[in-house]
Amino acid sequence: MSDPALIADGYAAADIRAAEAPLLAAGAQLMRVAAAGLARACRALAPDGPVLVLVGAGNNGGDALLAAAELAREGREVGVIRTAGRIHEAGAAQAVAAGVPITSADELDDATLADIARSSALVVDGILGIGTTDSPALRGEGRRVVAALLPVVTAEGGPAVIACDIPSGVGCDDGAVPDPAVLPADVTVTFGAGKAGLMQGPGRALAGRVELVDVGLDLSGATPLVRAAR
């Protein structure tokens, strides 16, 4: 059986961002395509039950918010916990319009966070993506939330976990995990291209099954850091 993490070549974050740039400049709706793929994976992994979405700043959180809105419009019970003071405005607006409550993590103590996760069928990790420029380790409220949820998601019968693009706390290029506060994903839905960090180092074991959502990136001029088995 092939390694589920090696479904595609793994590229560096800088090459992926460079491939995204011309599409974004041309007005391509990359986030909408990514969010649809994320929502599809959520339905497949957990067809029923409440969904808890963890959202940080930036586009990774935007993908998660748009997916939350899509699931809520279909009738799923969805709640968002934001770990950053500011989150993706358009994504948040769509989530709120779909009836999704957004709660700031600093309003919830650790026991309450654990209780919310325990009552959920699925946790979506949209805290950090590939835009992290230094250490991928979670900090502040993001780290506290993940630390509070870890015993719940790793317990027998705990909720399933989907990572948005890459598990928060995993190095995109090398798979490094400098801090143990990382939610182990059952599925990682990655966008545009495989991330090398999903395919090597400690990150490989935390990624679970990797599903690639094609958003039309041209990486023909980039050299993969990790090559998939052919």
UniProtKB/Swiss-Prot annotation:
PROSITE patterns: YJEF_N. K(+) binds at residues 60, 125, 168. It catalyses: (6R)-NADHX = (6S)-NADHX; (6R)-NADPHX = (6S)-NADPHX. GO terms for molecular function: metal ion binding; NAD(P)HX epimerase activity; nucleotide binding. InterPro entries: YjeF_N_dom, YjeF_N_dom_sf. It comes from the Bacteria. The keyword Isomerase applies. Keywords: Isomerase, Metal-binding, NAD, NADP, Nucleotide-binding, Potassium. Residues 11-223 form the YjeF N-terminal domain. Its cofactor is K(+). It is an enzyme of class 5 (isomerase). Binds 1 potassium ion per subunit. Pfam families: YjeF_N (PF03853). (6S)-NADPHX binds at residues 59-63, 129-137, 165. Its EC number is 5.1.99.6. Catalyzes the epimerization of the S- and R-forms of NAD(P)HX, a damaged form of NAD(P)H that is a result of enzymatic or heat-dependent hydration. This is a prerequisite for the S-specific NAD(P)H-hydrate dehydratase to allow the repair of both epimers of NAD(P)HX. Belongs to the NnrE/AIBP family. This is NAD(P)H-hydrate epimerase. It comes from Clavibacter michiganensis subsp. michiganensis (strain NCPPB 382). The gene is nnrE.
